[in-house]
């Protein structure tokens, strides 16, 4: 996925399309048994790429079963569980996006 992101970034740069930020999707999951974060695809890879390309890193979205269920049912996480951890992640990303645009 990181290779595809690099290709996309390079393509957008070639055609002079501004990139307003990068979000890392499926960045980690929290184990139901031990409550620990597990980075199964690597850690901070997208953040490092964002720094290298001088693009704002907006945040990360973990792998989350409830988010998948909400998405499958067409119910946004912010509507279904506005105080949940996933909703907080989306709000943080939105705030970081606003900061990068100011």
Cite the ranges covered by each PLM segment:
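Conserved Switch II/interswitch segment of TRAFAC-class P-loop GTPases
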Residues: 1-7
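C-terminal lobe/tail of nucleotide-utilizing enzymes
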Residues: 11-102
């Amino acid at each position: 996925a990181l290779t595809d992101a690099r290709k996309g970034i390079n393509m957008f740069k070639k055609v002079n399309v501004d990139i307003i930020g990068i979000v890392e999707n499926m960045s980690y999951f929290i184990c139901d048994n031990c409550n620990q974060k597990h980075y199964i695809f690597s850690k901070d890879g997208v953040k490092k790429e964002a720094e290298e390309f001088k693009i704002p890193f907006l945040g990360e979205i973990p792998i989350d079963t409830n988010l998948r269920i909400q998405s499958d049912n067409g119910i946004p996480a912010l509507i279904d569980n506005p105080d949940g951890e996933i909703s907080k992640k989306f709000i943080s990303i939105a705030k970081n996006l606003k900061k990068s645009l100011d």
